[in-house]
Amino acid sequence: MVGILPLFVVLLIIVSFAMVVAVPVILATPGEWEKSQGIVWSGAGLWSALVILTGVFNAVPA
């Protein structure tokens, strides 16, 4: 259990960085929102799941 928490934190950092870079670019590019809407929503879902999983594994006693 000790090794999974740092993995979730690293994945959360990577997904957060990708979303911070990708979402403004997608929204600023004309016509790109219609093509990439599914990717943005999938990224948001993945980010939310990682936040919840990180919190759950942080709260579970070792």
From Swiss-Prot:
Q: Which GO terms describe its biological process?
A: photosynthesis; photosystem II stabilization
**Claim: Thylakoid is one of the keywords in the record:** yes
**Biological role stated in the UniProt entry:** May control the interaction of photosystem II (PSII) cores with the light-harvesting antenna, regulates electron flow through the 2 photosystem reaction centers. PSII is a light-driven water plastoquinone oxidoreductase, using light energy to abstract electrons from H(2)O, generating a proton gradient subsequently used for ATP formation.
Listed GO cellular component terms? chloroplast thylakoid membrane; photosystem II reaction center
Sorted alphabetically, the keyword list is: Chloroplast, Membrane, Photosynthesis, Photosystem II, Plastid, Reaction center, Thylakoid, Transmembrane, Transmembrane helix
Q: What's the protein here called?
A: Photosystem II reaction center protein Z
Name the source organism. Emiliania huxleyi (Coccolithophore)
Classification via HAMAP family: PSII_PsbZ
- Note the Pfam families from the entry: Ycf9
Q: Where are the transmembrane segments?
A: 8-28, 41-61
* Record's subcellular location: Plastid, Chloroplast thylakoid membrane
What's the subunit arrangement here? PSII is composed of 1 copy each of membrane proteins PsbA, PsbB, PsbC, PsbD, PsbE, PsbF, PsbH, PsbI, PsbJ, PsbK, PsbL, PsbM, PsbT, PsbX, PsbY, PsbZ, Psb30/Ycf12, at least 3 peripheral proteins of the oxygen-evolving complex and a large number of cofactors. It forms dimeric complexes.
Family membership noted in the UniProt record? Belongs to the PsbZ family.
Lipid bilayer topology? Multi-pass membrane protein
